[in-house]
Amino acid sequence: MADMDGFREANNFGFGQTSQFDNFHVKGASNYSWGMKDRLSRIFNPKTGRAVMLAFDHGFIMGPTSGLERIDLNIVPLVQYADCIMCTRGILQTSIPANINKPVCLRSDAGSTILTELNRNVLIDIEDAIRYNASAMAVMFSAGDGEQEAITAANLVEAVDMGNRYGIPVMGVTAVGKQMARDSRYFALASRVCAENGASIVKTYYCDGFEKVAAACPVPVVIAGGKKLPEKEALELCYNAVNDGAAGVDMG
């Protein structure tokens, strides 16, 4: 059994070398089924392999947080500028017009709110993802959380199993435990574990040394926004992330 003594710093990332096994515009997807490739092609531009994803799923743990009080007024006008939207099924069916013609990354797990510690996390039924014509399902993986790491890993695996059955990719969303340092070593661990468990996309945070995170992950990595930043800083963050290997952003 591996232990922390064997968790040595990696350094051979092959920066600048593309995968020898990719003949598809989405990293790591060459051997996927037709349906999986089709859905990923809706999210990632076939000409660039990149995506701008608009995330507004925050309400499922934070309620009507600032800027998301009225999805119909604040978010719907922005949808046309995104390649893909990420939201919950409740918001999708109540607030997003069905004729927007944008791929949906459906938030597919649910658990505690910000009022409590994470104590339970469950998956929605795969039939709902199909019913909402989801192009991907988003599921959290909480690395370094002694209480929830195994549970969220099991949820991720279950979602991948269901997604593979019906040709729907899964995006692993990394939530790093409180006791873990927010650095490239641990974001690389969380991202790689998502990919190793079958996630087709990984959402994580930008950090110093992010090029290691992206290079060591065999599927596309998109970055989360985190705390609100001034516009110029947010754009610089996105620019740096893409330069360091991110396939895009998933920000709200």
Q: Could you tell me what each predicted segment is?
A:
Residues 1-57, 90-101:
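N-terminal amphipathic alpha-helix/helix-capping segment at the start of soluble metabolic enzymes
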